[in-house]
Amino acid sequence: KAAVLPVPHARMGNCGTLVNQLWNHPDFGLDMPTWMVKRGVKDPRRVMIVSQDPLRTNHKAGALALSTPFGFHSADYRSISCQNRTLCRFVERLLEECEVCVYLTDCRKFYTSDNFVNSHKGQFKGLFGNVLNDELKAFAPNLIVTLGNYAADAIAAKRPRAGLAVQSVNNLKVLAAYHTGARPNHFKNVVESGRKSDYFDEVFKVVHKELGKRGKQR
């Protein structure tokens, strides 16, 4: 089953005209949030993962290119790059080993390869914030994992420090993680190997400890 959170016109603020222009943009990326839970799991804890934006790489669609964050809906996308594989393995471990419900979304809802969205970021910021707040209310996460600075900034007025610590932000529990596309030296600040896969293994352990576990941790 799928559910869509409508955005009333009044919530658009001064972005209505800009959004209408996007529909005719030759290269417009939009990712549908993904809500996942392992079949048969009852009353799971909830983890919300907030990433950056619906990036489109070498994909001139000529129109709206609709997908999901990190292409998670597609087995092909889940395996085509180290960045996707790392994030998808992290999510799959949350679903299988922690048996939590995962909601995967972007803080910046639109992407264009030109400067259209960035040049109007001041106007879009309010709209993106409104939608993210609606998602927070609908999903009611026990823990939020942000990926990168944009996502951390969207959750808190004062950016949480990236690393492996769960912090309390506006009555929400937040783990501000590095983005999967971050430079290796960022990961090396936390794990000796500097490998993003090892870093996200550590992130998983923190989430596992914070939320508790029904089975055995590998």
Segments the model singles out, each with a brief description of its role:
Residues 164-199:
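Short, flexible loop segments at boundaries between secondary-structure elements
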Residues 102, 198-199, 203:
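Intrinsically disordered, low-complexity N-terminal regions enriched in serine/proline/glycine
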Residues 8-15, 192-196, 200:
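Intrinsic-disorder-associated interaction segments
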Residues 204-218:
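A charged, well-structured terminal subsegment
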Residues 133, 137, 201-204, 208:
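Amphipathic, non-transmembrane alpha-helical secondary structure
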Residues 1-159, 173-183:
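A polyanion-binding, active-site-adjacent surface
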